[in-house]
Amino acid sequence: MWNLRDKYAIAGIGYTDFTKQSGRTTRSLASEACLKAINDAGLDADEVDGIISYNMGDSDPGIAVATELGLPRAHYMNDVFAGGNVAVMVMLTATAVIEAGLAKNVLCFRSMNGRSGVRLGGSRDQNAYGFSQYTAPFGWMTYPQAMAMWCRRHMSKYGTTSAQLGAIAVNCRKNASMNPRAMQRKPMTLDDYFASRPIVDPFRMYDICLESDGACAVLVTSSAHARDLKQKPVYITGGAYGGGPSQGFSFEDIMRWPDPAHNCFPYIADDLWKSAGLGPKDMDFAEIYDCFTYSTIMALEGMGFCKEGEGGPYVESGAIALAGSLPVNTHGGLLSEAYIHGLNHTIEAVEQLRGQAGERQVANASIGLVTAGAMSCGSAMVIRT
């Protein structure tokens, strides 16, 4: 179990514009976000000595970004081949790297041209490799297809409705309307949600995250060092990564999953709350990995904000609204702000805790939850001021 409570902190954040057509390389986007994070922390580039990135073969490695930025002291580099499930894990890894003495100031970044470049589930080779050889020949080629099956299971088992999924989409859009960097700011009603075109049953267009070009970066350092830097430190209080007994994505792995009415979070929630010494009721807000509306329901249930099967009524009650008992995805989430594979959730959480969120600021926010991942494995952290 991660046991470095409050020893490390987020000292800087950076991000590019989020667009559909960046007209730039992923290296250029990453470099901009990383340089902004360095400047935000009040550091010089030569003080950064660690870089961790994650990608799915669609971006540049950390060493390329280190070269682009001219970092002379990059002693530790790690490129994690994974998706949104590690959007928090990379920062937990940064704390372990610093604890081990391998680096002092570690940049974590994700850069992607997810709309204009390599699109998840987009064009592919005529041959199937890896786990896709068990799925692609049967027409299962995209994440919406997989998650739709899981969602339908929850609907069948607990009576979850499309209107409840729509409540999540509408809430995200309302929050995004107050976010200058959000890609989708136009107000949306529940009627608009139901009018959006079907994609894969039971999902409509507004149940599925955006495709985005952009980059985000987060700088992690020791809490003692962070207190001497430019910004108010945001302490990493608790963290966890993991999943259940079957963490792959082939048909065989999916069929082994105990019950798609829940995902990875029931398996890591206890470790998270124990590592933080806190519980769900202590959170002022939550930034939930929402690649789909349904993933929000699974995370809220799995993390203990409501019981399994009660996520639909919970979101429909207004609890997740900005003025609710647990404001969720205050920036608009992956559904309305942008899809930078989840790292933009940490950007928003840090801004909330610094009191820099403007019109969408959660009153007196001092502690929050960030989750990453939607299916069989994921990560999460509690951060505070």
Language-model features and meaning:
Residues 57-68, 246-252, 290-313, 376-383:
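Short glycine/threonine-rich loop-to-helix capping motif typified by GTGT followed
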Residues 1-24, 167, 199-263, 267, ...:
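Condensing-enzyme catalytic core mediating Claisen C-C bond formation in acyl metabolism
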Residues 4, 54-109, 113-146, 184-210, ...:
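Conserved catalytic cysteine-centered active-site region
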Residues 24-31, 59, 88, 141-148, ...:
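Electropositive phosphate-/nucleotide-binding environments in soluble metabolic enzymes
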Residues 1-85, 93, 154-161, 183-189, ...:
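Conserved active-site "lid/cap" helical segment
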Residues 45-54, 76-79, 106-111, 163-170, ...:
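Beta-strand segments within the central parallel beta-sheet cores of soluble alpha/beta enzyme folds
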